[in-house]
């Protein structure tokens, strides 16, 4: 959530920044006007409460002196009624301010390319050259079905579209991939976590999914309480410190976790209908950081490098792009997308998204730290995929396929596969 004081003191700047994210200037004008009304109501209410307290003292003095206090008592009742009315107005105006504020996205960082869609995103670097095949490479879903390690048809029978069964060596490959990722991140200083997969509404609000993106998730009720299946481990990892004040000496804090991610994929009809790219349920290894404000953008570079190192170790070609202001996620000030090469599609596809959310999530979730001078400040939060496991499996199947239909296991995964060097 944005700081209303920043908007109030930098109205035109806020309009210009949020215009690059598709926000109409009228929304900023409205929230500024409501904020001005809110502050005026607060001033008037405080004045009346001060007058009421003075009147109360005058009544007490009059009673001690056995004087008539009828007028003061009547005046105090009138003041009390006015305060009650102003409090109701204040609550209504505050609700309107909050309604707008919680739906405004984060301010983009100056280093992000300006533009409303992905066509304005900027490629930063490429790593490795895509393999040249002397045969027509198959798509990963065809490879998986031919090898009997992926079964989309039976998953559709059981659950519907965008689900899969991993079988045999396929299941083992998935497990090898995420165990390798977790081990790598542990070496980089991340503390491994196993999180809840169901979270409450406060948690979804804290990381910015609610109230704007309720249609993108699956919800249920637990003992009368609405709960959400997590769309990413970012939600439980970030909310671990919700409503807490951390010791600044502990920062930065790194967490990593494997979890299933559940997504309704609302609005994705007709896109990536085959394969492992766009699923309703998939495994993902997540990275989350809590940092001091002055360290967060440097920590974003390090987090992105941590995700890249997985692909380098697996020798999977990729490139890194900085998302345009209008293409970044709701909570992000700056996002790097890492896209891996898929030969059958002859293109790069997203496999990781690493974002610096600055103090946007921390303000919503009230995650703070106490600095060495005793001052309490909001932390900065970062999150990134390290990596999406199913998409990594897809990239391995396509990039390591052989003409005879087998798939070579990337060398770092061989120990995790019990010494197996090929599937098929």
Swiss-Prot record:
Name the EC number(s).
6.1.1.11
Looking at the UniProt entry, the stretches that span the membrane are none
Tell me what organism the protein belongs to.
Answer: Latilactobacillus sakei subsp. sakei (strain 23K) (Lactobacillus sakei subsp. sakei)
What this protein catalyses is: tRNA(Ser) + L-serine + ATP = L-seryl-tRNA(Ser) + AMP + diphosphate + H(+); tRNA(Sec) + L-serine + ATP = L-seryl-tRNA(Sec) + AMP + diphosphate + H(+)
Function per UniProt: Catalyzes the attachment of serine to tRNA(Ser). Is also able to aminoacylate tRNA(Sec) with serine, to form the misacylated tRNA L-seryl-tRNA(Sec), which will be further converted into selenocysteinyl-tRNA(Sec).
| PANTHER family given in the database record | SERINE--TRNA LIGASE, SERYL-TRNA SYNTHETASE
- Main location per UniProt? cytoplasm
Q: Which biological process annotations from GO are given for this protein?
A: selenocysteine biosynthetic process; seryl-tRNA aminoacylation
| One Gene Ontology cellular component | cytoplasm
Query: What is stated about domains?
Result: Consists of two distinct domains, a catalytic core and a N-terminal extension that is involved in tRNA binding.
Sites where the protein binds L-serine? 232-234, 286, 385
GO MF annotation list: ATP binding; catalytic activity, acting on a protein; serine-tRNA ligase activity; transferase activity
Q: Protein name, please?
A: Serine--tRNA ligase
Tell me which HAMAP family the record gives. Answer: Ser_tRNA_synth_type1
InterPro entries the UniProt entry points to: aa-tRNA-synt_IIb, aa-tRNA-synth_II, aa-tRNA-synth_II/BPL/LPL, Ser-tRNA-ligase_type_1, Ser-tRNA-synth_1_N, SerRS_1_N_sf, SerRS_core, tRNA-bd_arm
Gene3D superfamilies from the entry? Bira Bifunctional Protein, Domain 2, Serine-tRNA synthetase, tRNA binding domain
Q: What CDD domains does the annotation carry?
A: SerRS_core (cd00770)
The pathway noted for it is: Aminoacyl-tRNA biosynthesis; selenocysteinyl-tRNA(Sec) biosynthesis; L-seryl-tRNA(Sec) from L-serine and tRNA(Sec): step 1/1
Q: Which family does it belong to?
A: Belongs to the class-II aminoacyl-tRNA synthetase family. Type-1 seryl-tRNA synthetase subfamily.
Q: Which gene encodes it?
A: serS
Q: How does it assemble?
A: Homodimer. The tRNA molecule binds across the dimer.
The residues listed in the UniProt record as binding ATP, with positions renumbered to this chain, are: 263-265, 350-353
Cellular compartments annotated:
Cytoplasm
Q: Kindly state which keywords UniProt assigns to this record, in alphabetical order.
A: Aminoacyl-tRNA synthetase, ATP-binding, Cytoplasm, Ligase, Nucleotide-binding, Protein biosynthesis
What are the disulphide bonds in this sequence? none
């Amino acid at each position: 959530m944005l700081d209303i004081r920043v908007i109030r003191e930098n109205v035109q700047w806020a309009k210009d920044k949020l215009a690059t994210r598709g926000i109409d200037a009228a929304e900023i004008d409205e929230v500024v006007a409501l904020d001005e009304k809110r502050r005026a109501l607060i001033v008037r209410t405080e004045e009346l409460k001060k007058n009421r307290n003075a009147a109360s003292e005058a009544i007490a003095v009059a009673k001690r002196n056995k004087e008539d206090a009828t007028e003061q008592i009547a005046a105090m009742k009138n003041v009390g009624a006015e305060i009650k009315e102003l409090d109701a107005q204040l609550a209504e105006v505050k609700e309107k301010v909050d309604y707008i504020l919680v739906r405004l996205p984060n301010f983009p960082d100056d280093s992000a390319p300006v533009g409303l869609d992905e066509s304005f995103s900027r490629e930063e670097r490429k790593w490795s050259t895509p393999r040249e095949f002397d045969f027509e490479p198959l798509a990963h879903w065809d490879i998986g079905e031919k090898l009997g390690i992926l079964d989309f048809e039976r998953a559709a029978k059981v659950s519907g579209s965008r689900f899969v069964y991993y079988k045999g060596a396929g299941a083992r490959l998935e497990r090898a991939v995420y165990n390798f990722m977790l081990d790598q991140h542990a070496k980089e200083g991340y503390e491994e976590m196993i999180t809840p997969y169901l979270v409450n509404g406060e948690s979804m609000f804290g990381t910015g999914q609610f109230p704007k993106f309720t249609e993108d998730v699956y919800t249920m009720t637990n003992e009368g309480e609405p709960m959400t299946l997590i769309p990413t481990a970012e939600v439980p990892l970030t909310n671990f410190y919700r409503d807490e004040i951390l010791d600044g000496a502990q920062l930065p804090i790194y967490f990593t976790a494997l979890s299933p991610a559940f997504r309704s994929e609302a609005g994705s009809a007709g896109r990536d209908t085959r394969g492992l790219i766009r699923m309703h349920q998939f495994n993902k290894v997540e990275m989350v950081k809590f940092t001091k404000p002055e360290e967060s953008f440097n920590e974003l570079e390090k987090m992105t490098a941590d995700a890249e190192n997985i692909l380098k170790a697996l020798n999977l070609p990729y490139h890194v792009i900085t998302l345009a202001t209008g293409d970044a996620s709701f909570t992000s000030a700056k996002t790097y997308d890492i896209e891996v090469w898929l030969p059958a599609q002859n293109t790069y596809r997203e496999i990781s998204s690493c974002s610096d959310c600055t103090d946007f999530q921390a303000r919503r979730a009230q995650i703070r730290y106490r600095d060495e001078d005793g001052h309490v400040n909001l932390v900065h939060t970062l999150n990134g995929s390290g990596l999406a496991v199913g998409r990594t499996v897809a990239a391995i199947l396509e990039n390591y396929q052989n003409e005879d239909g087998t798939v070579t296991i990337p060398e770092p995964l061989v120990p995790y596969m019990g010494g197996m060097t090929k599937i098929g």
